[in-house]
Design a protein with these regions (language model features):
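Eukaryotic polytopic
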Residues: 1-144
């Protein structure tokens, strides 16, 4: 019925979508905090936009292998892959910086509850690991 690669693609796309829903909720919870210096600015706006876009891409990829199809078109495919990689790195960088800034004393009003996993995951990471995760997720996304 389905090949193993199709099942893996569907599972990966579901996980990809759920993770980006979680990212969006995390960013929204920071935005809703009163007296939080992090609740406004380019990180919140762009983070919500990028993670919402990735949610839509993940949902589409569950039902149609659109990413695999688009990446094979010569001119459009290379641009799509490059934009995907840049957007994914930007999102991981935004989440990384938000988590890093939440720990500062001046941002003590920005503590969010229910997001310990994301805070613990990104608190001990650095920029090179964001690049590493971007490469891994991009390869999985386009080759599954």
């Amino acid at each position: 019925m389905f090949s193993i690669w199709t099942i893996l693609r569907i599972i990966f796309s579901i996980i990809f979508t759920v993770v980006h829903i979680y990212f969006t909720q995390f960013i929204n919870s920071i935005e809703e905090k009163k007296n939080c210096p992090l609740s406004t600015g380019w990180r919140i706006t762009n983070g919500k936009l990028i993670s919402s876009l990735f949610m839509i891409i993940g949902l589409i990829n569950i039902f149609l292998p659109a990413s695999k199809f688009l990446s094979t078109i010569p001119l459009i495919g290379s641009s799509y892959v490059l934009l995907f990689v840049i957007a994914l790195f930007s999102e991981l960088f935004i989440i990384y910086r938000l988590v890093d800034n939440i720990g500062d004393d001046e941002n003590s009003n920005c503590k969010v509850k229910g997001y310990n996993f994301i805070i613990n995951f990104f608190s001990d990471k650095d920029l090179s690991q964001c690049v590493f995760y971007t490469i891994i997720v991009s390869v999985l996304f386009f080759y599954l």
